[in-house]
Design a protein with these regions (language model features):
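N-terminal targeting sequences that direct proteins away from the cytosol to non-cytosolic compartments
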Residues: 1-109, 113-151
């Protein structure tokens, strides 16, 4: 039989958002009351996610395109596909991207939405070396992401 592993989770709540992440992940918060970035790194590998909130409410199209421009500069042979979805109760724009780096396939999920209070930008990345762990890590962060009304 396969190995069963229970993963304890923690909840990040601040800067107008909430999400659940594995307790053994590394988390760093940077920014001020206007703009903040939460960096969550998976403990077992290369997977990471950045969640940025911005009270100046920049256009999600521009945020996604800026991220894509940066990725295209670094990885001109990348493959991308639109990935718009309903996220945290909002229509989110985004892209799913694959590129080769250091002889590995890397995948990046970019999502962004704007509410009356803030713009929320999410970028998660993982490598094929991590198998399903990296993808599952990013998917669980995205699925648990919520915007809070009171901040």
């Amino acid at each position: 039989m396969g190995e069963f592993r229970t993963v304890r989770s923690e909840v990040y709540e601040g800067h107008g958002i909430r999400f659940t992440y594995p307790a053994d992940s590394q988390i760093e918060v940077d920014g001020d009351s206007e703009r903040s970035t939460v960096d969550v790194r998976h403990s077992d590998g290369l997977a990471f996610a950045l969640v940025r909130t911005d009270l100046s409410r920049p256009d999600p199209d521009l945020m996604v395109e800026a991220a894509m421009v940066a990725l295209r500069e670094d990885y001109p042979d990348l493959s991308e596909s639109p990935a718009n979805e309903f996220l945290a109760g909002n229509d989110a724009l985004g892209s799913d991207v694959e590129f080769f780096s250091l002889d590995m396939v890397n995948t990046t999920s970019i999502r962004c939405f704007r509410t009356p209070r803030r713009t929320v930008f999410f970028m998660g990345q993982w490598s094929d070396l991590e198998g399903d762990d990296g993808a599952g890590f990013i998917e669980s962060l995205l699925e648990s992401l919520e915007e809070l009304d009171d901040e």
